[in-house]
């Protein structure tokens, strides 16, 4: 029963890591990355469709994304969706593909993005701490119901804290790496 609590907490913390990685992928670092377009949805035959489902996204150069629609008739819709997105990148339509040239980041933009990364990282740590609190509460409930002894509770709390510390360290590492990537010129 005690292992189930730890496993559930680990699983939820892993989901937090994956969510953080997705969020970091959407923060542009001055170089082309297909995950920049993950949040772009295109109105395609009346249905909001993720861009990566109706077009291939390639990276021919370090700061260029090439969007090639599977259906050429959707080119205008894709261009409209890219213009409406908050990417800050102007699409160039040449009739068959759309080029997105990622502008070099200014020093001020880099600092702003680094602040955003810290904020997102901090939110992920708060989520992990909430998971820890839930796991601790569950362990205390089991001890109250006499399913585990007081000694087992203490051991379980230590194990939960260790899992939490590992998760927070992983988040700190991810945040530091993303900040370093952003501040590189």
UniProtKB/Swiss-Prot annotation:
Taxonomic superkingdom: Bacteria
Assign the protein's first listed, main location to one coarse class.
cytoplasm
Q: Which residues form a coiled coil?
A: none
Q: Which GO terms describe its molecular function?
A: ribosomal large subunit binding
Recorded GO cellular component terms are: cytoplasm
Recite the UniProt keywords alphabetically.
Answer: Cytoplasm, Protein biosynthesis
The record's listing under Pfam families reads: RRF
Annotated GO biological process: translational termination
Q: Where in the cell is it found?
A: Cytoplasm
Function in brief = Responsible for the release of ribosomes from messenger RNA at the termination of protein biosynthesis. May increase the efficiency of translation by recycling ribosomes from one round of translation to another.
Q: Which NCBIfam families match?
A: frr
Q: Which family does it belong to?
A: Belongs to the RRF family.
HAMAP family tied to this protein: RRF
Protein name stated in the entry: Ribosome-recycling factor
């Amino acid at each position: 029963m005690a292992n189930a609590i730890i496993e559930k907490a680990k699983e939820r913390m892993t989901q937090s890591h994956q969510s953080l990685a997705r969020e970091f992928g959407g923060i542009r670092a001055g170089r082309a990355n297909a995950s920049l377009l993950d949040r772009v949805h295109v109105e395609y035959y009346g249905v909001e469709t993720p861009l990566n489902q109706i077009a291939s996204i390639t990276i021919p150069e370090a700061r260029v994304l090439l969007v090639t629609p599977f259906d050429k008739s959707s080119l205008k819709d894709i261009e409209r969706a890219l213009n409406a997105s908050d990417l800050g990148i102007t699409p160039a339509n040449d009739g068959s593909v759309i080029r997105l040239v990622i502008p070099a980041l200014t020093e001020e933009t880099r600092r702003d993005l680094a602040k955003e990364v810290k904020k997102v990282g901090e939110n992920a740590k708060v989520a992990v701490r909430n998971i820890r609190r839930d796991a601790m509460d569950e362990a205390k409930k089991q001890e109250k119901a006499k399913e585990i002894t007081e000694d087992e509770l203490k051991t379980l709390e230590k194990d939960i804290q260790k899992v939490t510390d590992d998760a927070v360290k992983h988040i700190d590492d991810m945040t530091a790496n993303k900040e370093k990537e952003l501040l590189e010129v």
